[in-house]
Amino acid sequence: MAPIGEKKRFELEKSIEPIYTGGPVAFDSNEKILVTALTDRIIGTRSETGERLFSIKKDEDDYVTALAITSDSKKLIAAFRSRLLTIYEIPSGRRIKSMKAHETPVITMTIDPTNTLLATGGAEGLVKVWDIAGAYVTHSFRGHGGVISALCFGKHQNTWVLASGADDSRVRLWDLNSSRSMAVFEGHSSVIRGLTFEPTGSFLLSGSRDKTVQVWNIKKRSAVRTIPVFHSVEAIGWVNGQPEEKILYTAGEGNLILAWDWKSGSRLDPGVDTTHSETNAIIQVVPFSENTLLSVHSDLSLLLRKRVPGEGFITIKKLNGSFDEVIDCAWIGDDHLAVCSNTEFIDVISTDGTQVFGVLEGHTDIVLTLDSSEDGVWLATGAKDNTVRLWNLNIEDNVYKCIHVFTGHTASVTAVALGPLDVNGYPTFLASSSQDRTLKRFNLGSQLNKSDFSNRAVWTIKAHDRDVNAIQVSKDGRIIASASQDKTIKLWDSSTGEVVGVLRGHRRGVWACSFNPFSRQLASGSGDRTIRIWNVDTQQCVQTLEGHTGAILKLIYISQGTQVVSAAADGLVKVWSLSSGECVATLDNHEDRVWALASRFDGSLLVSGGADAVVSVWKDVTEEYIAKQAEELERRVEAEQLLSNFEQTEDWQQAIALALSLDRPHGLLRLFERVMTAPHQPNSITGNKDVDNVLVQLPDHQLIILFQRIRDWNTNSKTSMVAQRLLRLLLHSYSPEHLLKLSGIKDILDSMIPYTDRHLARVNDLIEDSYIVDYVI
């Protein structure tokens, strides 16, 4: 029996999965539905809650080139590289119509304000207008000499018009009433990436990668103003769509969104934009709400940017798009996680996956390791840039600050570990290891806030002969453990850096180690697929846990040190009881190796992250499970007693129904044997007419259960007579049409035929042998 307090059951509370892996994005501002493309599907997500509304399967090799959603939230239109244009019903995801759109892939498309027309632009330079309801072409416009890159519906002098831009640097205006070209605007020197009509319909604005916005007078067919925006433009539009505001935004290169007075050409928010990035660019912008835009970035991030007059567009929220490969995670606070995922940034996210609270920027290469303090205030990070950073986290105010940068390693930092907190709440020291095979200690404490703080290592030692994969600090801070590819775990005096023990026994490299916070034990996990529990004092292995089919990559203790949780390359997370040495729970929600594992400080939640870009949040439901088990046991005891009472009173109808619902094959067999050995009633197959009447009126779900029991009993000669009599009754009482509707009935009957033939042959042999008795007599 497991000790009191052990956790035996976990349920998946939240699976934070990628919603975006690149390509176009569509957004319905009315219902707040975000439509994005994944590798093998198109999904719709409620942007405010993260709830997945629909998922549309597509060919993995067929890339989505354009998306559009009607403003009434009823239809989604997707264009594919295969040149198909498909209309879907949402939220059901049902395909309404598919048709071949262009001779080349559709690059851009837009829907008119009435949800009647769809405009598509192809790579061949052709523009088509479609009737959405009828799914047929109403207009086809030729004239551009390159790929269509921007489209926009508008109204000019009560006439519906369509503007198109292409990589021939020209803007064309088409009259939808006459199906003719109204104007050709020339003035840009690069591809057109954004088009929008001034709210009165008198002017058309175009943005280009030539870093300018042109304002065109439609009536005069000429440019009235050129606005130099000083960045390559990928999108333009109106900040909130209100005509009286007339605030133009431009977005694109450098991660910038800027606000402009389109009449004067002056920038409205001259303050420094802190979101500027040389390597990250905005590839698409869609209106989200009043003064707020959703920007899609080349690094696959999705940001909500709100305009604050005088300050510019500030990031108010980051939506979880894709983590890429999750390498490590750490719990900070009650419902926040720090996650590193194959980038130089660390995301601070909510455990429900709805948003990213902050992004820790500072490392210049991929972050490989994290460790947080027990109070969630301090976070240590190590990266491929050979540096270690210490962060102070103010979760309540959502302020995250890098306090110090520690250097000295000559290769990627593979592991970091914080020492225990001092009386003032500061971590006493920080340990780090690297692919340079060294181990370093940096003193912290209250000196962190002093101007003369030294970020130099107190000591540096060559720890192992091969890469160091993991390090851990004991609860009291006296010992540092290091695990290496050289198959050993070494114990170090944290004050002096002297080795105090070497643990040998693993047959392959050791990937993980963890100190038991409540005893002098250490757990280690290796590429040999085993977990070893070591006595720190004697340095002997006291227990070996086996069950994974891949390398053990991460270990943590829970339940006051009575259990170990392991994450492995087989994609599984296992919970082990140290008292029995057995796995008490296996958590399966990953399709690739699980690198990251963390536990909330009260042990009520586990988090795992894997190479499949999925973060899984597991909730401890042991108490509910035990209570449910006790309730189920009580219910079964009562039902067993009730079944016994029914048998005693020969209430066969109630007895059979109860035995079937309890799924007790032995009890049901005993009941039928008793009926068939009792005095036989005439004209009854089972021997009792009441039983016959019950069996010929069974509901389908109980009927299929009975067929399954008959199949099992038919395999044994001792119980085959009961099975054959019941089978005869059922085949005579139910029509073939009725029986064929039962799920799996064909396989059940097919499996009974060989045994039935064998029983028939055995009975025939007995009959033949009985004639010998007649002959002798």
Swiss-Prot record:
Q: Keyword Transmembrane helix, does the record have it?
A: no
Give the highest taxon in the source lineage: Eukaryota
GO-annotated cellular components: 90S preribosome; nucleolus; small-subunit processome
Task: List the Pfam families hit by this protein, alphabetically.
Answer: Utp13, WD40
Q: Name one GO molecular function term.
A: U3 snoRNA binding
A single GO BP term for this record reads: endonucleolytic cleavage to generate mature 5'-end of SSU-rRNA from (SSU-rRNA, 5.8S rRNA, LSU-rRNA)
Report each WD repeat as a residue range.
14-57, 59-98, 101-140, 143-184, 187-226, 228-270, 362-401, 408-452, 463-504, 506-544, 547-588, 590-628
Q: Where in the cell is it found?
A: Nucleus, Nucleolus
Which UniProt keywords are present, listed alphabetically?
A: Nucleus, Repeat, rRNA processing, WD repeat
Could you list the residue ranges forming a coiled coil in this record? none
Spell out the SUPFAM superfamilies in the cross-references.
WD40 repeat-like (SSF50978)
InterPro entries documented for this protein: G-protein_beta_WD-40_rep, Utp13_C, WD40/YVTN_repeat-like_dom_sf, WD40_repeat_CS, WD40_repeat_dom_sf, WD40_rpt
**PANTHER family, sorted:** TRANSDUCIN BETA-LIKE 3 (PTHR19854), TRANSDUCIN BETA-LIKE PROTEIN 3 (PTHR19854:SF15)
Q: How does it assemble?
A: Component of the ribosomal small subunit (SSU) processome.
Function summary: Involved in nucleolar processing of pre-18S ribosomal RNA.
Name under which the protein is recorded:
Probable U3 small nucleolar RNA-associated protein 13
Record organism:
Schizosaccharomyces pombe (strain 972 / ATCC 24843)
User: What gene codes for this chain?
Assistant: utp13
